[in-house]
Design a protein with these regions (language model features):
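Small-residue-enriched hydrophobic alpha-helices in membranes
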Residues: 1-34, 38-210
């Protein structure tokens, strides 16, 4: 089983947490790809681009992915499994939701079944409608504004902007997320999100002449 493959010989609470998270993320990602009825190569590639799987575990992960992608049914249970590991709206949960959005849009516009899937997962994770709309804006085909990426209004003052950016950069830093239980396999996804946050802040500061 995937659980035994990932689990260390003497699991500690943090290691057990990382195993549970990894298994649930693979299942949620596979079922996300199946949400609109068809799993495309683009969706599989999107998962592999954001999640680093060690060569020794590729076959095991592949078998579990193939099993999970047979049907989107049961995704709520995996979402609840992840949600129990963290406080509501935790940065790690936002990273996971961002990954699911990335998979959903990888083969074109986000479809209605995919949107329903994402909405349900977001609710289980504790995110409200405003949170969801902010994350959705990041994945629209026309691209988000730098303010949408940071989750602030365009009239925010310079001092508050800098404070908010520093908070985001700290909470979404891979080291912070790893300490909170995110497995190292997902560092690539975390780095991608952090790069977007920093790039958005750079754009705004240049626009404002800061």
């Amino acid at each position: 089983a995937v659980e035994s493959k990932f689990a260390p010989s003497r699991p500690d609470p943090q290691a057990t947490k990382r195993v549970a998270f990894t298994v649930a993320v693979i299942a949620l990602s596979a079922k996300m790809a199946k949400a609109d009825g068809i799993v495309t190569r683009d969706e599989i590639a999107a998962f592999r681009a954001r999640v680093h799987i060690p060569p020794s575990e590729v076959k095991q992960v592949g078998r579990f992915w193939d099993l999970a992608r047979q049907t989107p049914d049961g995704f709520e249970d995996y979402a609840k499994q992840v949600a129990r590991l963290f406080v509501p709206r935790a940065p790690v949960l936002e990273q996971l939701l961002d990954l699911l959005f990335h998979i959903a849009k990888s083969d074109g516009d986000i479809t209605s079944p995919e949107l329903s899937y994402l909405t349900t997962v977001a609710g289980i994770f504790g995110f409200d409608e405003a949170d969801f709309d902010r994350l959705l804006a990041l994945h629209q085909s026309n691209g988000p504004s730098p303010y949408e990426i940071l989750g602030v209004s365009s009239d925010i003052d310079d001092q508050a902007l800098r404070k908010h950016w520093k908070h985001l950069a700290r909470t979404h830093h891979p080291d912070t997320l790893t300490a909170d239980g995110m497995p190292e396999e997902f560092i690539a996804a975390a780095n991608n999100r952090l790069a977007k946050i920093n790039a958005a802040y750079d754009v705004i500061t240049r626009q404002r002449g800061l």
